[in-house]
From Swiss-Prot:
One of its GO terms (molecular function) is protein kinase inhibitor activity. Residues 92-107 have a biased composition (Low complexity). It comes from Homo sapiens (Human). GO terms for cellular component: cytoplasm; cytosol; focal adhesion; ruffle membrane. Coiled coil: none annotated. Pfam families: Sprouty. The lineage of its organism: Eukaryota, Metazoa, Chordata, Craniata, Vertebrata. Changing V281I: In HH17; without anosmia. This is Protein sprouty homolog 4.
């Protein structure tokens, strides 16, 4: 309750009132503040704070900020009119409902003021990066020595017996030259010339149309084979047909000549190894002035 006003003081509108002190529970530091004497007409209930609504944790002040110069810079605080200055430690009792509602409104507004971010001091903005940093290309450490040229690395498998390359390109057999004629419809080769010159193409056509579907391919492609089916029937038919077409008797000698020519051409043109069932070793390749030695590794 508010202390009674002494009767000796005149009750006039222009009279002043000394703010009452709180009970003995008030701290000694708060009692040392000087008391402010305000006229009655300047006391406004809209600026009275409610201790049960205000959040004291939101009213924490931020510390001083340091600028580039090193001098601390204090954050500016919002200035208020002297007429609106109120003490947080003053409490009143017996307030009407209108006072509490206006106090709640002012407390909410003050909470919003505290939650607003403090103004940031003007600082020099960092310069925008306009030049990209240079990329340093680090070369990996070559632990295997200098690289071997592709020509030498391709032919590093050598035969242990003859010393020639055993790669697929070098060791594959070479065939006699051939070409396609008549708009890519006829193959001109040594074996084709023998088939047409000895009339063996006629026998192949007969075997193609008269044999079973399972054996027509093998009999037509290899009419003189002894390991195919119907061997006796085929040879009997070719012997009877050779009486009418004696050129069929030249088929076997001509085919033998083609095989010999194939072997001679392959021997001259094949650069790789022609040995069978031999081991291969890794050659010692040299790149530039430095020679890279690899250990022999049989396969």
């Amino acid at each position: 309750m508010e202390p009674p006003i002494p009767q000796s003081a005149p009750l006039t509108p222009n009279s002043v009132m000394v703010q009452p002190l709180l009970d003995s529970r008030m701290s000694h530091s708060r009692l040392q503040h000087p008391l402010t004497i305000l006229p009655i007409d300047q006391v406004k209930t809209s600026h009275v704070e409610n201790d049960y609504i205000d959040n004291p944790s939101l009213a924490l002040t931020t510390g001083p900020k340091r600028t580039r110069g090193g001098a601390p810079e204090l954050a500016p605080t919002p200035a208020r009119c002297d007429q609106d200055v109120t003490h947080h430690w003053i409490s009143f009792s017996g307030r009407p409902s209108s006072v509490s509602s206006s106090s709640s409104t002012s407390s909410d507004q003050r909470l919003l003021d505290h939650m607003a971010p403090p103004p940031v001091a003007d600082q020099a903005s960092p310069r925008a990066v306009r030049i990209q940093p240079k990329v340093v290309h680090c070369q990996p450490l070559d632990l295997k020595g200098p690289a071997v040229p592709p020509e030498l690395d391709k032919h590093f498998l050598l035969c242990e017996a003859c010393g020639k390359c055993k790669c697929k390109e070098c060791a594959s057999p070479r065939t006699l030259p051939s070409c396609w004629v008549c708009n890519q419809e006829c193959l001109c080769s040594a074996q084709t010339l023998v088939n047409y010159g000895t009339c063996m193409c006629l026998v192949q056509g007969i075997f193609y149309h008269c044999t079973n579907e399972d054996d027509e391919g093998s009999c037509a492609d290899h009419p003189c084979s002894c390991s195919r089916s119907n061997c006796c029937a085929r040879w009997s038919f070719m012997g009877a047909l050779s009486v009418v077409l004696p050129c069929l008797l030249c088929y076997l000698p001509a085919t033998g000549c083609v095989k010999l020519a194939q072997r001679g051409y392959d021997r001259l043109r094949r650069p790789g190894c022609r040995c069978k069932h031999t081991n291969s070793v890794i050659c010692k390749a040299a790149s530039g002035d430095a020679k890279t030695s690899r250990p022999d590794k049989p396969f």
